[in-house]
Amino acid sequence: MATPAGLERWVQDELHSVLGLSERHVAQFLIGTAQRCASAEEFVQRLRDTDTLDLSGPARDFALKLWNKVPRKAVAEKPARAAEREARALLEKNRSYRLLEDSEESSEEAVGRAGSSLQKKRKKRKHLRKKRQEEEEEEEEEEVPEKGKKTTGGNKPQTEKPESEDEWERTERERLQDLEERDAFAERVRQRDKDRTRNVLERSDKKAYEEAQKRLKMAEEDRKAMVPELRKKSRREYLAKREREKLEDLEAELADEEFLFGDVELSRHERRELKYKRRVRDLAREYRAAGEQEKLEATNRYHMPEETRGQPTRAVDLVEEESGAPGEEQRRWEEARLGAASLKFGARDAASQEPKYQLVLEEEETIEFVRATQLQGDEEPAAPPAPTQAQQKESIQAVRRSLPVFPFREELLAAVANHQILIIEGETGSGKTTQIPQYLFEEGYTQKGMKIACTQPRRVAAMSVAARVAREMGVKLGNEVGYSIRFEDCTSERTVLRYMTDGMLLREFLSEPDLASYSVVMVDEAHERTLHTDILFGLIKDVARFRPELKVLVASATLDTARFSTFFDDAPVFRIPGRRFPVDIFYTKAPEADYLEACVVSVLQIHVTQPPGDILVFLTGQEEIEAACEMLQDRCRRLGSKIRELLVLPIYANLPSDMQARIFQPTPPGARKVVVATNIAETSLTIEGIIYVLDPGFCKQKSYNPRTGMESLTVTPCSKASANQRAGRAGRVAAGKCFRLYTAWAYQHELEETTVPEIQRTSLGNVVLLLKSLGIHDLMHFDFLDPPPYETLLLALEQLYALGALNHLGELTTSGRKMAELPVDPMLSKMILASEKYSCSEEILTVAAMLSVNNSIFYRPKDKVVHADNARVNFFLPGGDHLVLLNVYTQWAESGYSSQWCYENFVQFRSMRRARDVREQLEGLLERVEVGLSSCQGDYIRVRKAITAGYFYHTARLTRSGYRTVKQQQTVFIHPNSSLFEEQPRWLLYHELVLTTKEFMRQVLEIESSWLLEVAPHYYKAKELEDPHAKKMPKKTGKTREELG
């Protein structure tokens, strides 16, 4: 039999001839597998299960030869096994003896002797088996020498296992143990959710019962207290009424007596009686006259004036009027004095009336548009409606009946009943988002505790649509109708219509993989093709096959409906005709160099020259929107009363809800509203009264480079589909106009047909983690509508493996299952889980919450730049930006979460309040992932190590040419707003790498290279972290010329 070393060389040689390649670890794996197999067929079957070898022909012959060559301990029978075999034979023999007939005494004695001897042999066999198992375990732990030798004797190992087998078995045992822990954790989470749901209902019922009891008690007490007062009031009213009635009766009685007995002589008693009645009547009249005189005098007294003011005809901007800018009062006084000095009256001012708009319509500023095409509408308007029609709407039910989807209500419900999956095509504003869920609710799809889910790609859309539907149904938002977005849940156990972002529905699959509590799932705005929408398509398609009673509706705005139908196994398409008026499209004669300035000029140009109607402007992001609004307000302020009032209203995702709602308010008479929005207004929102649309032709898109791991949010030209959607916003209520700030040639030749799906241009770490949590392991063959690049998918798997979320077989680990429960980036999840090890979870929660508010903590007013920068520097702490964020939140919490503190320190209160909400939700999820709360008590080294445990992938070190990432060797730069911008530490960790003017590192943290080996020894090697410039030359004593010879 060959030695282990010789056998390994033989396997390597054979692998060359069979596979064309050879590797030492593969040879050791094959030898170890052959040693564990009891037969050659079992060995062949195990190799076939790996799906790496084609076991036909030479490969099968090689496997059989290898199994015959591999030494096995079962060849020579050990003495212990022989003794066990003899004892088993004796036991069988004794059993056969028991069946013979014999006297009871002799039989009992024989059985007793046999039993006693059998017990001794059993003890001996038990001892031998235990000893043999210990010897085998010792044999497996020993290493294989270069030249193995056979040993004699049953107590010595015959062969020694190779090192790779021991490592493989240990890894396999750890993998199986981790899988058991993961499944146990998932079961605990599921049971905890179940218990919590039941407790919520019980608490709700108990609370409702207590509230009703309290209400009844208060009603009884109020009734007892009110009855005496009501009696007094009723008595007084009755007395006044009785007085009037008695006086009327007395006057009637006197009139009758005068008419009947006026000419008759009366007795003395009758005359006295008549005189008494007249006296009583006169006194009553005098009393009434005195009361009326007192009331008349009371009306002549001074009374405090009552509130009689109505709605102002001109909108008042409180922020503008209460402006506290330096010198504001002096500026107003000077303007008033100058205005009084140059005041003119009458016809002398007529000559200056003609060029009153010269600041807007100067020739060098005016943008010339050319009418190119017209989008035909379905209806011809009789006349342009006045803006006041928005204030004179019908009731909510009348508005519902006026929507284009209403005439097709019965047909739509019949199509939903007859088909499991239905594609709905309809224009934005046709009512499919708000009305179809209500139709399904009225039809009874929410009976027996079932719910209807409607997904939206954006948070703002989910919140605004839910509020609108709640008003139409006459219920409070959060009861029957609610919404669920990231870090905010406005639902209850009574919610049956649930609007949510598509990412939140994906997270529902974790706790309810079959969506058993939903009867209908509606994926709205499917044409936007967001990352989560594409993942939802694959999952819902699979769930629909498993649950035939589940209804799936895919709503799209006239784009890609045929492709959606093909993807869902040729599902039928239900088309809702849109109510759209003609739209004239205008292009510029020449390209515009600065589209932001062109937008501002065009808005004023439309405002001055065009008939009444609101304006919708599309810009790329919050910064551009705020800049455009500021420019418009400044120019309108300079023009003053020369132009009509122009209301400038922004709309973007981070805007507070109350300010978002302003765009839906009716425009005051005599004014014009301009809404400056991102592409959220393309399809997700419908704003009434829009007649004019300004389209610069740009949008912001996130792109991801898997080779460098860098994300960039760049301004890119929009697609033709998006441009047509924007133009369609102008034809909602009347014939409109769309002004495109680019040429017709650019539209035809420079714009893409459709937008690239987000799944093909973003990082997939969260998606891979979620799909793995749902038990989907074969990601390469997952049913994507548009598959992502394999390079991006492989990088996501590599990152999750480095973070410990996946094992070497690509299976989800216990840590990965916990990371999937946290609705944040995988690196941020790893940082939160690692905080338990370093006892700093309180601080890490704060850092994670502050990192989740999109770098919008500080603000710099243009007139107070120096003060804002000084306030920011006051928060700096040694160590990096993460500790600065922690310091800001800590001081804000110590101030009692004060908004005044934020104003004084140039911190955005809205962002801090959102960070507090995020922290509270993450703190609630810590119990779910079984992480305890702890604080480091100011030991920031532990905080920095916990952050390093999650973001060791994002590290850079200082070289002679600047900062370079450790792995990719990419040149990067510290962002100028960082607290470490001037310090330049040798080793850095960054939160994200963004491409703007340069490759900037945002939110950097100073670390030590030894921490990387501590938290990620599997990812970094000591040689990679050595600094070649820090090495010193060895000290050596020089020699003289004589010594050198």
Curated annotation (Swiss-Prot):
Top-level taxonomy: Eukaryota, Metazoa, Chordata, Craniata, Vertebrata
Disordered, as annotated region: 101-211, 1026-1045
Modified residues annotated as Phosphoserine in this record: 103, 106-107, 164
Keywords assigned: ATP-binding, Cytoplasm, Helicase, Hydrolase, Immunity, Innate immunity, mRNA processing, mRNA splicing, Nucleotide-binding, Nucleus, Phosphoprotein, Spliceosome
Domain Helicase C-terminal: 602-775
Motif stretch (DEAH box): 524-527
Alphabetized InterPro entries for the sequence: DEAD-box_helicase_OB_fold, DEAD/DEAH_box_helicase_dom, DNA/RNA_helicase_DEAH_CS, HA2_WH, Helicase-assoc_dom, Helicase_ATP-bd, Helicase_C-like, P-loop_NTPase
PANTHER family assigned to the protein according to its UniProt record, in alphabetical order: ATP-DEPENDENT RNA HELICASE, PRE-MRNA-SPLICING FACTOR ATP-DEPENDENT RNA HELICASE DHX16
Annotated residues for binding of ATP: 426-433
One protein family per Pfam: Helicase_C
Official protein name in the record: Pre-mRNA-splicing factor ATP-dependent RNA helicase DHX16
Helicase ATP-binding domain ranges (all copies): 413-577
Molecular function GO labels: ATP binding; ATP hydrolysis activity; helicase activity; molecular adaptor activity; pattern recognition receptor activity; RNA binding; RNA helicase activity; ubiquitin binding
Gene behind this protein: DHX16
Subunit structure: Component of pre-catalytic spliceosome complexes. Component of the minor spliceosome, which splices U12-type introns. Interacts with GPKOW. Interacts with TRIM6. Interacts with RIGI.
Compartments where found: Nucleus; Nucleus, Nucleoplasm; Cytoplasm
Annotated signal sequence range: none
Organism of origin: Sus scrofa
Compositional bias segments (type: Basic and acidic residues): 170-211
GO biological process: antiviral innate immune response; mRNA splicing, via spliceosome
UniProt EC number: 3.6.4.13
Family: Belongs to the DEAD box helicase family. DEAH subfamily. DDX16/PRP8 sub-subfamily.
Comp. bias (Acidic residues): 135-144
SMART domains listed in its UniProt record: DEXDc (SM00487), HA2 (SM00847), HELICc (SM00490)
Protein purpose: Required for pre-mRNA splicing as a component of the spliceosome. Contributes to pre-mRNA splicing after spliceosome formation and prior to the first transesterification reaction. As a component of the minor spliceosome, involved in the splicing of U12-type introns in pre-mRNAs. Also plays a role in innate antiviral response by acting as a pattern recognition receptor sensing splicing signals in viral RNA.
Modified residue annotations for Phosphothreonine: 716
